[in-house]
Curated annotation (Swiss-Prot):
Active site: D208 (nucleophile), E245 (proton donor)
Gene3D superfamilies noted in UniProt: Glycosidases, Golgi alpha-mannosidase II
Binding site for chloride: R206, N308, R343
Organism of provenance: Drosophila lini (Fruit fly)
Residues that bear Pyrrolidone carboxylic acid: Q21
Entry's family note: Belongs to the glycosyl hydrolase 13 family.
Record InterPro entries: A-amylase/branching_C, A-amylase_C, Alpha_amylase, Glyco_hydro_13_cat_dom, Glyco_hydro_b, Glycoside_hydrolase_SF
GO MF: alpha-amylase activity; metal ion binding
Cofactor remark: Binds 1 Ca(2+) ion per subunit.
First and last residue of the signal peptide: 1-20
Name the record gives this protein: Alpha-amylase-related protein
Record keywords, A-Z: Calcium, Carbohydrate metabolism, Chloride, Disulfide bond, Glycosidase, Hydrolase, Metal-binding, Pyrrolidone carboxylic acid, Secreted, Signal
Residues that coordinate or bind Ca(2+): N118, Q169, D178, H212
Length: 494
């Protein structure tokens, strides 16, 4: 009986920990993460204070923070080839990182670090030098900056069969030296690295290539981490938020269900299906059942996105900034529909898969510059600064904890719905106008469309909609309008 009670206690403790790892630790009603891909720490700190906090963003996913190999031309993916756990990259050093985390936490913006637990750098001719000056010999699996040696890695092999669990989890993903997370020593180094970031005030981690590591090894590592640092405003006993990169199209040998009990999982099917719909390859009317009916994970387990730094570079159904009208419609739907833990992308311009972030002649990452409207102009795309996107972050905050209701569609690609009595969204992806009296579910009054403009000094700078005492308003979205979406909420009432 004593053994049974102890086993039950340990089981419940494990379940409690994994449940806690689904909590993003947001402030107030904020509930959207932005990925400031390849930004410098000093620029993120300023962005938290001057833009993200005033507009209600909840958190920032940052690029990998630990030392990486220096590759010719400085492609973005060099950040995913670590050679030590020293906190020095082209984004800045440890002091600058710590300053950024503190300043962002001070204004209610949580920081989530993209972490590389699966591997170290791939092969390199001779001695490689990292961004902190550390030398390594990746071809010999020698990384003295940790230190790691060959005994800390799985034997080298190539993934040739993605239906072979052994290959997926113990061979080398695109040639990257595959760490043995079952080793006590490797586990200790990974835990030490993550705990240091927790000490500096981060709220959690995006775990890169999670499906290439055994779930039981990750469970041990996550369960061994420290609680979040209360000196950065986290409650006592708060656990780091975990979201794991698991690409699962529904027929994978290693499935997302092996990981969703440990933390949230990146829902790639969401990205693919929302792209198909807003590219016109699937009628928007079918989105009424969006979510688990589409085979997605449950809402609290799914990290959702229109695109990410990887799949925005691939051909196919996924939308990116290069299709701005459809991209903004898809993002508006993403942030308005009550499903998932939402993340929006903030990119830099690219012409090919390997394009580096904006950099100067000395290959230093440059800071974003802004025009008079606040949009980025020097190679940074900054989708999060597009009015149509940051306005929907405010919409999502305004309607938090409300249900979807009053769905309407025209049987094709015009849809609308309410979020309780706090918000209304309409979308027109047809080649003809949407002109219709629709139920907005809002209290009577005049409302600004936050897509086409803003509420400033008691007046709308874009479209406005009069809502009658029954909650109905006349909605017009022309087929040739700049944006194919209209959004109203209670905080944009004149």
């Amino acid at each position: 009986m004593i053994k049974f009670a102890l086993a039950l206690t340990l089981c419940l403790a494990g379940a409690s920990l994994s449940l806690a790892q689904h909590n993003p630790q947001w402030w107030g009603n904020r509930n959207t993460i932005v990925h400031l891909f390849e930004w410098k720490w000093s620029d993120i700190a300023e962005e938290c204070e001057t833009f993200l906090a005033p507009r209600g963003f909840a958190g920032v996913q940052v690029s990998p923070v630990n030392e990486n190999i220096i590759s010719a031309g400085r492609p973005w993916w060099e950040r995913y080839q670590p050679i030590s756990y020293k906190l020095t990259t082209r984004s800045g050093n440890e002091e600058e990182f710590a300053d950024m985390v503190r300043r962002c936490n001070d204004v209610g913006i949580r920081i989530y670090v993209d972490v590389l637990l699966n591997h170290m750098s791939g092969d390199f001719d001779g001695v490689a030098v990292g961004t902190a000056g550390t030398e390594a010999e990746p071809s010999k699996k020698s990384f003295p900056g940790v230190p790691y040696s060959a005994q800390d890695f799985h034997p080298s092999c190539e993934i040739t069969d993605w239906n072979d669990r052994f290959q997926v989890q113990q061979c080398e993903l695109v040639g990257l030296k595959d760490l043995n997370q079952h080793s006590d020593y490797v586990r200790s180094k990974l835990i030490e690295f993550l705990d240091h970031l927790i000490e500096l005030g981060v709220a959690g981690f995006r775990v890169d290539a999670a499906k290439h590591m055994a779930a039981e090894d990750l469970e041990y590592i996550y369960g061994s981490l420290s609680n979040l640092n209360i000196e950065h405003g986290f409650p006592h006993n708060a656990r780091p938020f975990i979201f794991q990169e698991v690409i699962d199209h529904g027929h994978e040998t290693v499935s997302r269900e092996e990981y969703n009990g440990l933390g949230a999982v990146t829902e790639f099917r969401f990205s693919e299906e929302i792209g198909r719909a807003f590219r016109g390859n699937n009628a928007l009317k079918w989105l009424q059942s969006w979510g688990t009916d589409w085979g997605f994970l449950s809402s609290e387990q799914a990290l959702t996105f229109v695109d990410n730094h990887d799949n925005q570079r691939d051909m196919g159904s996924v939308l990116n900034y290069k299709s701005p009208r459809q991209y903004k419609m898809a993002t508006a739907f993403h942030l308005a529909y009550p499903y998932g833990i939402s993340r929006v992308m903030s990119s830099f311009a690219f012409d090919d898969h390997d394009t580096p972030p904006p950099q100067d002649a000395q290959e230093n990452i440059i800071s974003p510059e802004f025009d008079e409207d606040g949009a980025c102009v020097n190679g940074w795309i900054c989708e999060h600064r597009w009015r149509q996107i940051y306005a929907m972050v405010g919409f999502k905050n305004a309607v938090r904890d409300t249900e979807l209701s009053a769905w309407w569609d025209n049987g094709d690609n015009q849809i609308s719905f309410c979020r309780g009595n706090k918000g209304f969204l309409a979308v027109n992806n047809n080649q003809y106008d949407l002109s219709q009296e629709l139920n907005t579910c809002l209290p009577a009054g005049e409302y600004c469309d936050v897509i086409s403009g803003s509420l400033i000094d008691g007046a709308c700078t874009g479209k406005s909609v009069h809502v009658n005492e029954h909650g109905y308003g006349y909605i017009h979205i022309g087929s040739d309008d700049f944006d194919g979406v209209l959004a109203l909420h209670v905080n944009a009432k004149v």
